[in-house]
Amino acid sequence: MRKLLKSFKTEISPTIEQKIKINKTIGTCRYVYNFYLDHNKTLYDNGEKFMTGKSFSVWLNNEYIPNNPDKIWIKEAYSKAVKKSIEDGCTAFTRFFKHQSAFPNFKKKGKSDVKMYFVKNNPKDCRCESCLLYTSPSPRDPKTSR
């Protein structure tokens, strides 16, 4: 039996600073995803072993960014969002190696659906609060019609 999930679409109206942070994070996620694909493709062409998402994340933070100071802007994005984009790239390669999908595509600005992980209740950026929706009881509801 399939489980049905209920979702609600809400419109957000971020401030200018929040829009800048969101755009930077989405751009960084796109760059890191493409960089992960390119790095593994280069390793494959050189006959080296495939780099998993975890080892790529360690290499990116401990070796690549310190040796390339022009790429320090990667650290400005949410770390969880960057890790999630690396995980997505790793999943794409894993599915490719299992012959479940084609070779992963590079993401292009404006043409690809880039996903981003939002940090919940980060006090520096925004605060998400839950709200309860109250509905009036239905006249046909047996629990409330007594």
Predicted features and spans:
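Nucleic-acid substrate recognition interfaces
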Residues: 1-136, 140
